[in-house]
Each structure stands twice: as structure tokens, then as C-alpha cells.
Amino acid sequence: NKPWAKNLSFDEFCHYILPYRNGDEDLSDWRSYLKQKYEHLITDSLMQNANTKDLAEFMMRQIRKNVKYGTQFNRLIQGFLTPKETEKLGALECKACANYATMVMRACGIPCEVIEMRWRFTEVPHSSVLFPKTANNPRPFRLTIGDSLTYMGEPKDTMATYRTWAYTYEVNKDLMDLARDKDVPRKFWQPLFRNDVTSLMCTTYDMQLPVPDSLKIKNYLFLCRFDNWEWYPIREGK
């Protein structure tokens, strides 16, 4: 019933607002907790304007008062935490920050999701919050606690990234098929609750590559990049 979400389809609502987890964080009553903490801060002018971009930037400024980006706890905790765990630590790496910001936005009825980008110039991925294209947001963008707003599909991102995932907390059937193949390494399909959104992040191309006869008996083949001392799949083919 929020102005910025009233034109969402049912599928969009289920995908961007309804999910109660982004990953493997402990279950908690985070929605009512964060709604009470943040929703009253939204001004009447923002309510009337219903502009997702302005609202997202305003909410992120409020979020940064409670949680900041920092790397001092990287060796102790990474990934998905409950909101109260995040606030207690105060400064966390990018995935935890994006997870917290996404839950705040969803608690206030703002459609979004966590994305994870693989950069060609660094060995570690980066996470942010994607605000998708909707009736009230004509151009998708990303924004998180440690980064400024950036529209998706900028030329610099095409040069810098090679794969982007969105965490949806719904099982990806294609990844589930990979998991059933005993020849596919576990790290190539875990986690299952994500969808490929690389085409939103950068320009993508179809390629045809010759397959050696010795590999034609395999169900799947992967085009990979050596990243962080291990192979990471850029794209898979069946």
C-alpha cells in the first residue's frame, strides 16, 4: 500500500519485497523491528513524490547512521546476519551491509534485492543493493552503505565486471540441475538461491566455442576465470 510499491505486480512483490531471508541468516522478527525503526523517518514529501531513487538515497543516509562499511571484522564474520547482529557490530563488509540495507528497504515496502558482482581487477566479489526497474523507477540502479548510487549498465561496468548474481531466496532450477551432476564441483553451483543478472550489469554476448572430442561426453562445460586461487565459472553450457 506504499506509493512507491502500489504499481508492482504480484510477482514483483513476491520477488522484491516479500522474501523473509536473503541467505542463511538466523530467523528473526526483522520486518516489524526495522519497520518501527525506519518507516516513521520517511517524510510526507517523499511519500507524495514516490520516487524510488530519492527515497533510496534518503533511506541509505538514515541506515548509515547505524551501520557503516568496514573490514575490521572480515576474518570473524562474513555474509548474512540478522539486523540486530549487524547493528551490534556496527561496521561490516559489503555483503553484510547490503543484506542489512535490503531488509530495511523491504520492511518499508521498497522493492530491492542483494546483488554480488565479480570484478576483473580484484579477487574478491562486491555486494550492493539493486533497485529494479518498476513503474516508479524507470532505470534500475544500485546503492549500498559504502557506495554512491550507480545506474546499472554503465559502460565502465561492462569493462570491469564479468558476472553478477542476485540473491533471491528462491531456488534456481538451473543451478539445481548442476547440483545433480556429480562431475560439477560444488562451488560451481552453491548457493542455489540466486539468479544471474549479468545482463543488467553489463553488455553480454553469445559465443560459440569448439569442444574437444574428449569433453563431449560431459553434460556441462564451463568457461572459467582463475580468481582468488580457484576457478570461477563465467558461463556454463549444456
Name these PLM-found stretches.
Residues 1-89:
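Secondary-structure boundary elements
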Residues 1-3, 20-22, 66-67, 139-238:
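Alpha-helical and coiled-coil interaction segments, frequently adjacent to or embedded
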Residues 9, 28, 32, 45, ...:
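Generic serine detector
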Residues 46-62, 76-80, 84, 89-90, ...:
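Hydrophobic/aromatic-rich core segments of domains that either
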